[in-house]
Design a protein with these regions (language model features):
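A short C-terminal boundary segment appended to hydrolase-like catalytic domains
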Residues: 126, 134-141, 171-202
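Core catalytic region of metal-dependent phosphoesterases/phosphodiesterases
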Residues: 8, 17, 24-93
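Beta-strand-turn-beta hairpins that frame and shape the catalytic cleft
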Residues: 20-25, 90-99, 139-145, 167-173
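Aromatic (phenylalanine/tyrosine) cluster motif
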Residues: 4, 10-12, 21
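Conserved beta-sheet core of the metallophosphoesterase superfamily
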Residues: 73, 108-171
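Catalytic metal-binding/acid-base residues of hydrolase active sites
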Residues: 32, 57-58, 79-80, 104-106, ...
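Helix-adjacent hinge/juxtasegments
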Residues: 73-78, 82-124
Length: 202
C-alpha cells in the first residue's frame, strides 16, 4: 500500500493461464476503526487477489496490510483529514482502468455525476467509492459504479456490507454481501442514470 495519499497508478495484470484470467477483489469502506470484522470476513473468502479499502479510516487499511498477506490499495477519506482533489488511485486491469476514491471530494452524497465525470476524464471504465455508507452496484453504457457500503456504520436499517468484485478482460461484476446473510436489506442497484441527482437516499 502506498504511504502517500496522492494519486497513484497500480497495474494489476494477472500472470495466469488464459483459462484462469480472473481478478477477485475484496472491497470495503468506512470501517471507522473496527477493522477486525473486515479481517475476519476476508479470511472466510476464497481466491481473493486484492483488497481495496476506500477510506475512513486510513489506519484500518494499514492494519489490514500488516496482518494479511495480500496486495492492498487504500485511500484516505474525510475522517482521515484528507481534502486533496488528487487523493485518488487508478487501478489498471485487463478489463480497463478503475478509479478509486473515498468520494467526499466528488460530493457523492449529492450526486454521482462528479465522480463519473472525473473517472471518465481519466479514461476509467469504473469508479469504486465509499463515504455514503450505502451499498451500490450499477452500470450504464459500459461504465460501472461500486460502493460496498459500510461494515461498521451502515445506514437505513441495513446490516454491515462489503463487496466482492470479479474482473475479467471483457467484464466487471460485483456482489454486495452482508455480514448477516439471513437478512438482506435493500441495496441501491440498477441504472446509473436513474440514480443521478436522486438525493432522497441521504
Amino acid at each position: 500500500m502506498q504511504e502517500n495519499h496522492k494519486s497513484w497508478i497500480y497495474r494489476f495484470s494477472l500472470l495466469k493461464t488464459q483459462e484462469d484470467f480472473v481478478l477477485r477483489i475484496f472491497v470495503i469502506s468506512d470501517t471507522h476503526g473496527r477493522v477486525d470484522k473486515a479481517i475476519e470476513i476476508y479470511k472466510k473468502l476464497d481466491d481473493i487477489d486484492l483488497i481495496i479499502h476506500l477510506g475512513d479510516h486510513w489506519n484500518d487499511a494499514r492494519r489490514m496490510k500488516e496482518q494479511l498477506n495480500v496486495p492492498l490499495i487504500g485511500v484516505k477519506g474525510n475522517m482521515d483529514g484528507s481534502f486533496d482533489r488528487e487523493g485518488y488511485h487508478i487501478l489498471e486491469t485487463d478489463f480497463g482502468k478503475i478509479f478509486i476514491a473515498h468520494g467526499h471530494m466528488e460530493s457523492v452524497k449529492q450526486s454521482y455525476e462528479n465522480i463519473m465525470y472525473k473517472a471518465e476524464s481519466l479514461n476509467c471504465r469504473a469508479a469504486f467509492f465509499g463515504h455514503t455508507h450505502i451499498p451500490l452496484f450499477a452500470e450504464a453504457e459500459g461504465f460501472y459504479l461500486l460502493n460496498p457500503g459500510s461494515l461498521s456504520l451502515p445506514v437505513g436499517g441495513r446490516k454491515g456490507s462489503y463487496a466482492v468484485a470479479t474482473v475479467l478482460p471483457g467484464s466487471l461484476s460485483a456482489a454486495i454481501l452482508y455480514e448477516d446473510v439471513q437478512q438482506v436489506p435493500k441495496t441501491e442497484s440498477g441504472s446509473i442514470k436513474n440514480m443521478l441527482n436522486d438525493s432522497d437516499r441521504f
